């Protein structure tokens, strides 16, 4: 075991970049090669079936079960032509991963043989065991039935020899047990609410689509070195390890030259992702050593979420092929930046208008201001809930550190937009518009330059920043399912727009002009949501105090943050928008608390095992070597001179004794504290106990271990150090 670390390091240095077979076609030609997209639908489906299916996808029409057999037959034909032998209902349970059960395209032919079959019934619906997935008590073990149901708005795709069918996952009694079902409901809610508001400006708008562009950060670690770190293998992060002398302080990794092995991995990943219809656009080194980013072109929100889940799975497979392990944990290494997944969110009409982009006419700019302000209203009203949507045991390590957005949700708008909203709020109403004959009201809002997108500065400390034509939600964790944040954001914006329209309609019904009514409500909302606007340093202590004064949620305990899901305002918002019921919210919180507890529990067990089976034996072994050296020197030179010559060694012997004693007592305390916490039956209280009592004890043990790493002989230390984990690739 002593030499395993060095063998792993030597093996890592011997690795060379793999040759990647690049397709002869252009990327645009092999894009979505493994996706049953519209082109394939048109080719394989009867025209009337194709038109009915696209009506479902584009217009939300009810799926006609009569076409399911035709669609299933076409999918099977296309899939088998591409070497597919199995199919699966691919869904996203509350594990934050994906789930799938593969079935073959075979049935008895009645003659002792087999025949390839795939019916509309198998396409549309299956029955996984709902009790075996996180369900928050909705399903008991003896109440196993759940349903997965086809989502036709997200195209099926091929992974290896399996046809993957995106589905929702619900209980026998209809409650959502996944991320996709409430996401689809939230997208419907924001579509309906935004479309109604758009009709103030353009009656031709029939649909508003929420877009999402995610930016996936990750770390790559050599597979051999990774295999000698049990903490990385079992928890996704290093539970111990002293800083490397060189980490990110030189600012030389960000946008630096991509290492050759990593470049080969990225190339291979992009080719496979493009074949799966994921429109990869950007790749680069991130700030921390060993950290990288991949970002696609934005897509419709539901599809973007599916693509991110596919990509995270694909990354692991491709990394293994190239001799790496990909780390998606938000904070795999202490002392350097963690990983996030910025979610760029926007709304677009079916007439091609981006609702968060300024226009060329006064009416366009009024519409722009409406959607900006109502988005801010949503974030203001539900800032604590938005934070809860991105909180987890893993993201807890990243949020609030001076590397990521703070754990207080605020919005940065930039000087131009801030000045505009201040002008609308403070100016006399008569100065904001003028009457222009029979054309009605004409806004006198100062011109918003077309270069707004370039004139909007960046504030990396802002969790929810306006970046010219969209909002960037930066608090989402790298390992998270984007749907969690998008469900809350879409529902909150839908509620804000609905409330806005009700008030405007009331003023119009009272005889006020439409434009005047819109301005009245917008001015009121600008004042109301002003506390959410913050353009300063989100890391400062002054901001934390100011945020409390503004009434913003400043809670930093992850388990306590989950309470926001069951606040009266949150439940009312989810029920108003038909996104989730009170029972579904309650069940999800149970899952969140249980998941938090289990993750910390695993970490506590792993750190206890590592320190007692690796660190303490290594340290005491080195201590014994030093003691023998001291005794030998005394035997040769005499007690007085021998002690003088070995003064440094004696000091280290004492330090090792003190630190190992603290570690051993710390592990004993950790175990006893865990036993106390495990006796707590309430999921929320147990999670809080783990957060408040166990996490600090783990940190105290780590502190002693990291100090020992600096004094114990490098030759004896069995766990790869940060310099090896981060710089050998």
Feature annotation, model-predicted:
Residues 60-61, 66-96, 215-222, 462-481, ...:
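Short, solvent-exposed linear motifs at loop/edge-of-secondary-structure regions
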Residues 1-24, 132, 141-157, 162:
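N-terminal hydrophobic targeting/anchoring segments and the immediately downstream early-domain regions
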Residues 143-328, 333, 337-340, 347-590:
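Glycine-rich, acidic/polar active-site loops that bind/position phosphate-bearing ligands
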């Amino acid at each position: 075991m002593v030499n395993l670390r060095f063998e792993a390091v030597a093996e890592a240095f011997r690795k060379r970049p793999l040759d990647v077979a690049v397709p002869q076609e252009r990327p645009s030609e092999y894009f979505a090669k493994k996706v049953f997209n519209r082109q394939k639908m048109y080719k394989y489906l009867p025209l009337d079936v194709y038109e009915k299916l696209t009506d479902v996808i584009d217009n939300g029409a009810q799926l006609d079960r009569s076409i399911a057999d035709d669609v299933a037959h076409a999918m099977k034909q296309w899939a088998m032509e591409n070497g597919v032998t199995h199919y699966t209902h691919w869904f996203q349970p509350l594990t934050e991963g994906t789930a799938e059960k593969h079935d073959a395209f075979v049935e008895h032919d009645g003659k002792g043989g087999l025949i390839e079959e795939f019916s509309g019934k198998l396409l549309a619906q299956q029955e996984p065991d709902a009790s075996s997935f996180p369900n928050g008590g909705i399903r008991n073990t003896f109440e196993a039935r759940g349903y997965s149901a086809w989502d036709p708005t997200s195209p099926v795709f091929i992974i290896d020899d399996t046809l993957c069918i995106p589905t929702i996952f619900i209980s026998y009694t209809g409650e959502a047990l996944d991320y996709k079902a409430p996401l689809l409901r939230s997208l419907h809610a924001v579509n309906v609410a935004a479309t109604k508001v758009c009709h103030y400006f353009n009656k031709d708008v029939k649909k508003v689509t929420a877009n999402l562009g995610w930016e996936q950060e990750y770390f790559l670690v050599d597979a051999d070195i990774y295999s000698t770190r049990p903490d990385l293998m079992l928890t996704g992060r290093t539970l111990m390890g002293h800083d490397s002398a060189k980490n990110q302080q030189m600012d030389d990794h960000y946008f630096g030259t991509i290492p050759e092995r990593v470049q080969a991995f990225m190339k291979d990943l992009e080719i496979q992702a493009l074949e799966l219809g994921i429109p990869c656009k950007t790749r680069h080194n991130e700030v921390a050593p060993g950290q990288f980013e991949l970002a696609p072109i934005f897509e419709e929100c539901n599809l973007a979420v599916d693509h991110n889940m596919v990509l995270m799975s694909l990354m692991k497979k491709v990394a293994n092929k190239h001799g790496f392990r990909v780390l998606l944990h938000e904070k795999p290494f202490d002392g350097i930046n963690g990983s996030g997944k910025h979610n760029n969110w926007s709304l677009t009409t079916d007439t091609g208008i981006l609702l968060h982009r300024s226009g060329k006419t006064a009416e366009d700019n009024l519409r722009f201001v409406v959607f900006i302000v109502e988005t801010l209203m949503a974030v203001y009203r539900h800032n604590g809930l938005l934070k809860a949507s991105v909180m987890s045991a893993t993201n807890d390590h990243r949020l609030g550190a001076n590397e990521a957005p703070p754990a207080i949700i605020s919005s940065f708008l930039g000087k131009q937009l801030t000045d505009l909203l201040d002008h609308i709020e403070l100016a006399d109403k008569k100065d904001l518009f003028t009457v222009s004959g029979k054309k009605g009201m004409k806004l006198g809002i100062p011109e918003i330059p077309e270069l707004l997108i370039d004139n909007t500065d960046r504030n990396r400390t802002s969790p929810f920043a306006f970046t010219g034509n969209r909002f960037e939600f930066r608090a989402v964790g790298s390992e998270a399912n984007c749907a969690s944040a998008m469900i809350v954001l879409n529902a909150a914006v839908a509620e804000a727009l609905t409330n806005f329209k009700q008030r405007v309609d009331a003023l119009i019904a009272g005889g006020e002009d439409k434009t005047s009514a819109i301005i009245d409500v917008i001015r009121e909302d600008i004042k109301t949501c002003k506390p959410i606007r913050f353009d300063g340093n989100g890391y400062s202590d002054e901001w934390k105090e100011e945020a409390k004064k503004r009434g913003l949620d400043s809670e930093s305990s992850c388990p306590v943050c989950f309470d926001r899901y069951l606040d009266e305002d949150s439940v009312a918002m989810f029920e108003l928008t038909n996104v989730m019921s009170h029972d579904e919210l309650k069940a999800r919180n149970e899952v969140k608390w249980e998941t938090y507890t289990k993750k910390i529990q695993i970490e506590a067990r792993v750190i206890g095992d590592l320190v007692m089976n690796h660190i303490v034996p290594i340290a005491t072994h080195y201590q014994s070597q030093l003691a023998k050296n001291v005794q030998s020197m005394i035997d040769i030179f005499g007690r007085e001179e021998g002690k003088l010559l070995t003064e440094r060694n004696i000091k280290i012997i004492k330090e090792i004794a003190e630190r190992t004693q603290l570690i051993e007592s710390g592990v004993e305390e950790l175990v006893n504290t865990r036993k106390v916490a495990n006796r707590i039956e309430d999921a929320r209280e147990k999670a809080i106990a783990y957060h408040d009592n166990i996490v600090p004890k783990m940190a105290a043990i780590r502190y002693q271990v990291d100090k020992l790493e600096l004094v114990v002989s490098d030759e004896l230390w069995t766990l790869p150090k940060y310099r090896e984990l981060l710089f050998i690739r």
